[in-house]
Structures are given as C-alpha cells and as structure tokens.
C-alpha cells in the first residue's frame, strides 16, 4: 500500500476544467501541493489563483511526450518529488455508428485518451520505483466496461485500452513495488462540459438526468488515493451495473 505523505505533491493533467479542476480544488482544500497541466493556459492560471497553497502551473499538451517529460521535470524542480500523478486529460467523440468511425477518429481517441496516459505512466513510474512508493491514477470511464452508448464507441474503445494498460502495469508492479498504488477511476456521467467539447459535439453532460456533480466525483477520487479499491467506481451502483452487463453477455 502506498504511504500517505503529508502534504502530498500531486500532478493533475487536464486540470483546466471538469473532473481535473474538481480534483485540484478538492486536494487544495486538503493541503496538497499541486502541479496543474493542460493546454488552456488562461483557465489553468485562473484556477491556480483561486486555490490556496503551493501550485505550479505547467501549460502542456500531454499527447506530446516531450511535454509530459517537461511536466515531470517542473514538478521535481519545484517540489523535489511527485507523490501522486493523475492522468485525467482526455476527450470524447460522437459518431452515429461504429460503422461511421474513421481511421482519423480512432487515432484521435487513442492519442488523446490512451497514449497521453501511457506517456504519464512512463515518465512518473520510474520516479516512483526509485522512491519505492507513489500513486498513479488513470481516469477512465464506465463506458470502457459497459459500452452501451454506441455514439461513443471510439471513445469507449480508447478507454478500454487504457484499462488494459493500467491493469497490466498493476500486475507488473504488485510483486516488485508493492508500495506503488495503481488506481483506475471509472466515472459515469459527470456534470461537466465533456459532451460539448467532444469531437462531433454531443449532449451537454450537465443536462443528463442523474449526472454526478463534479465535487462529489472529486471527493471520491481524493478519498481513494491512498486506500480502498484499486478499481474506483464513482457511482455507488457501478460494480453492480458492470456485473449485470457481464451476466447479460454471458447469458446467465
């Protein structure tokens, strides 16, 4: 189990809005030192100014490996270590059918949702290994386990690939580095601008009945950094819904 440092140094990608900004606000309130990164610098700086405590702003494109290296280097230069790295950056896409997904669509989803997180894993895990501890958090989606929203098929597939990378790394580290915690977060619909920002547009997530508040999701993630399940469903009915889906597919 990862050691809970006080206060932790936390890197958050995709921190300019949505779940990433919510996590930053929640952890700042708990006294964490933060490194916030996203492409939208004005939004990042506005968020940083609203937070208390030590905050480093690093505008970057996490689909570019050199940028991710730079985020890690800035974190180490400012704070001397990284305790938690949250791969939250990502984007959706809306297409009417699986058959309508183009090569470019799939490549964009893998770039934004899978490869960007892989870069984060590759740059921070060696640091965790050298220190003998750390927490890696990859934010996925319930759609990666229950791909019922077919208009999000390419998005769901890219997040399913992220799940596989996360679980493979977890297996790889559990015997050699038991104090490195690898957490997979599986949110449902969250009241953010995710739908509006999707390639091809989409329904406004904030108008979907039952959408979780960002603050609730951020609190659940913050509570689960250092203890609790490694597959972290932000909806209380998440595991039951996944199990029901598997049973349906299996015909049992």
Stretch-by-stretch model annotation:
Residues 16-17:
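Conserved glycine-rich cofactor-binding loop
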Residues 30-47:
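Conserved glycine-rich Rossmann-like NAD(P)H-binding loop of the short-chain dehydrogenase/reductase
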Residues 60-70, 103:
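The beta1-alpha1 cofactor-binding region of Rossmann-like NAD(H)/NADP(H)-dependent oxidoreductases
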Residues 96-98, 105-107:
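Substrate-binding pocket helix/loop in short-chain dehydrogenase/reductase
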Residues 121, 158:
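Active-site helix of classical SDR
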Residues 141:
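Residue(s) in the substrate-gating loop at a strand-loop-helix junction
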Residues 184, 200-244:
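C-terminal helical subdomain
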């Amino acid at each position: 189990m990862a050691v809970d440092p006080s206060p932790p140094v936390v890197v958050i990608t995709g921190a300019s809005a949505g779940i990433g900004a919510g996590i930053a606000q929640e952890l700042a309130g708990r006294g964490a030192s933060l490194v916030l990164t996203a492409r939208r610098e004005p939004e990042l700086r506005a968020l940083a100014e609203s937070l208390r405590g030590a905050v480093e702003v690093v505008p970057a494109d996490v689909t570019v490996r050199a940028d991710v290296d730079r985020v890690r280097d800035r974190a180490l230069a400012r704070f001397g270590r990284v305790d938690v790295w949250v791969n939250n950056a990502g984007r959706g896409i809306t297409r009417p059918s699986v058959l309508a997904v183009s090569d470019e669509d799939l490549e964009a989803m893998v770039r934004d949702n899978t490869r960007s997180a892989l870069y984060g894993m590759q740059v921070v895990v060696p640091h965790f290994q050298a220190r003998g501890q750390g927490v890696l958090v990859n934010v996925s989606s319930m759609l990666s386990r229950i791909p019922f929203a077919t208009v999000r098929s390419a998005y769901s597939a890219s997040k399913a690939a992220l799940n596989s990378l996360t679980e493979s790394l977890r297996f790889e580290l559990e015997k050699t580095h038991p104090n490195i915690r690898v957490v997979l977060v599986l949110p449902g619909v969250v009241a953010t601008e995710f739908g509006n920002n999707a390639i091809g547009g989409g329904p406004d997530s904030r108008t979907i009945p039952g959408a979780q508040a960002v603050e609730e999701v951020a609190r659940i993630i913050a509570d689960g950094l250092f203890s609790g399940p490694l597959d972290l469903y932000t909806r209380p009915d998440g595991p039951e819904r996944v199990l029901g889906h598997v049973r349906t597919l299996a015909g049992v």
